[in-house]
C-alpha cells in the first residue's frame, strides 16, 4: 500500500518530489551517483518488466470493470422495469383501495338507510308509532323464543323420523311398534283435545263418534303429509351436507395450495411483523406508498448518476493508461532510469486500489437497493392481502344489501313511492323548462347565423367599394399628374412665345429704323410699338389671371383641379 495522501496527486498524474510514492515516508531517494551503469541497466530492465506487467494488469482490470459495468447497466435496467411494474401495481392497488373504500362508504350509508327503513316498517306493523321501543323489543324477543322453540321441535321431529326410517329398514321389532303406538296414541289424544276445544253445538254420542273417526282419518292423512315433508327436509339436508363436504374439500385443497405457496415464500414469512406494521401504516396513510415509490425513483436516479461517475472514472483511468504508455515509450527511448517511473508506478497502484474500493462501494449500494426492492415486494404482498380482505368485506356487504333489498321489496313504502313520484314530476318540469331554453337558444342561433350571412355580404360589398375607391383615387392622381405636366408644358410654351414675340418685335423695329431712318418718325413708331408690346403683356396677364386657383384651406398648397384638391384635402385632414 502507498502512504501517499489524496491531496498529493496532481492533475497530470505526476507525484511531488517531496515524499516517496511507495514504502515508508522516512525512506530517502536513492542517489544516481552511487550506482554503476550496469546496475542502472538492470534496474531499467526490471522497471520495464514491471511496467509491462502493470499494463497487462490494467488491461485485465479495464476488461473486468467493463464487464461489471455492463452487468450493472443490465441490472439497473431490470430494476427500472421491476420498479415500473411495481409502480403500476401500486397505482392499481391504490385505485382499487379508493374504489373499495368509496363502495364501503356507500354500502354503509345504504345499510343505515335500510336499518332506518326496517325500523319504520316495524313501527308500521305495530300500527301505533307512539308505542315505546321496550314493548317492540319484548315482542321481538318473544318471537325469537318462539322461533327457537319451533326449531327445537323440528329437530326432535327430524330425529324421530330418522329413527322410524331406521326401524322400518331393519324389520321393525316390538319395541319400535310400541313407540309408534305411543306416538300415535299421544297424537290421537291431542287431536281429540282439539276436537273438544273446537267451538260448536253439542250433539249425540253417534255424531261425536263419527267426528272422532273423521278426525283420526284426517290426523292420519296429516301425519303422512308431515312425514313426507320431513323426508323432503331430510333429503334437502343431506344434499346441503354433501355440498358442504364438497366445499370443505375445495377449501382444503385451497389451503394446501396456500401452504405450498407459503413454503415457497418462506423468506417473506420471516418478515410478517414488518408486514403487519406496514399494513397498519398503509391503513393509516395510503399515500405513503406513493412517497416510497418517489424515494425509490430518486435512489434509482442517484444510482444512475453514480454509474455515470464510474464510467467517467473508467475513461479517466484509460486516459491515465495512455499517458503511462507514452511515458514508458519515452523511458525506453531514453534508456535512463529516473525516480519519476517509481512515482508513476505508485500512482497506478493507488489508482487501481481506489477503483477497487469504488467498485466495492458500488456493490454494497447495489445490495442495499436489492434489499429495498425486496421490501417493496413485501409491501406489495401486504397491499394485495389488504385488497383481498377489502374484497371479501365488499362481497359480504353486497350480500347483506341484497338480503335487505329482498326484504324491502316485499314491503314497499308508500312514502318512498310518493317521493319518487314527486322527483319524477320535478324532473319532468325541469326537462320541459330546459327544452324551452333549448328552443330559445336554437332561435337565437338561427338569427345569429342569418346576421353572420348578412355581415359576410356587407363585408364583400365593402371590399368592392374600397377597391373601386382606390381605383378612382389612383385614376385621379394620374389625371392630376398629367394636368401638372400639361401646365408645366404650357408655361414653358408661353415663355418661349413671349421670347419669340419680343425678338420679332425687336427685329421689326430694327427693320423699320433701317428703312426709314427718320428720327421723329422713328420716335413715333417706337411709342406705337411700346404701346403694342404693353397691350400684349396685359393680355397675357389677364389670361393667367383667368386660370382658377385651387388652394388647400389647411396647408395652402395650390392645385390645378377640384378633384386633385379633394384628394389632397382628404389626405391632409387624415
Curated annotation (Swiss-Prot):
Region (Interaction with Rab8): 58-209
Motif LIR per UniProt: ranges: 176-181
Protein induction: Down-regulated upon treatment with dexamethasone. Not regulated by hypoxic conditions.
Chain residue ranges for the region called Interaction with HD: 405-574
Pfam (any one): zf_C2H2_10
Ranges spanned by the short sequence motif UBAN, renumbered to the chain: 468-473
Gene Ontology annotations for the cellular component aspect, listed alphabetically: autophagosome; cytoplasm; cytosol; Golgi apparatus; nucleus; perinuclear region of cytoplasm; recycling endosome; trans-Golgi network
Zinc fingers classed as CCHC NOA-type: ranges: 544-574
Tissue-wise expression: Present in aqueous humor of the eye (at protein level). Expressed in trabecular meshwork and astrocytes.
Cellular compartments annotated: Cytoplasm, Perinuclear region; Golgi apparatus; Golgi apparatus, trans-Golgi network; Cytoplasmic vesicle, Autophagosome
Residues covered by region (Interaction with MYO6): 406-515
PANTHER family found in the cross-reference section: NF-KAPPA-B ESSENTIAL MODULATOR, OPTINEURIN
Self-association state and partner proteins as the record states: Self-associates. Interacts with HD. Interacts with GTF3A. Interacts with MYO6. Interacts (via UBAN) with ubiquitinated TFRC. Interacts with GTP-bound Rab8 (RAB8A and/or RAB8B). Interacts with TBC1D17. Interacts with TBK1. Interacts with TRAF3. Binds to linear ubiquitin chains. Interacts with LC3 family members MAP1LC3A, MAP1LC3B, GABARAP, GABARAPL1 and GABARAPL2; OPTN phosphorylation increases the association (at least with MAP1LC3B). Interacts with RAB12; the interaction may be indirect.
Domain notes per entry: Ubiquitin-binding motif (UBAN) is essential for its inhibitory function, subcellular localization and interaction with TBK1. The LIR (LC3-interacting region) motif mediates the interaction with ATG8 family proteins.
Protein name as catalogued: Optineurin
Gene that produces this protein: OPTN
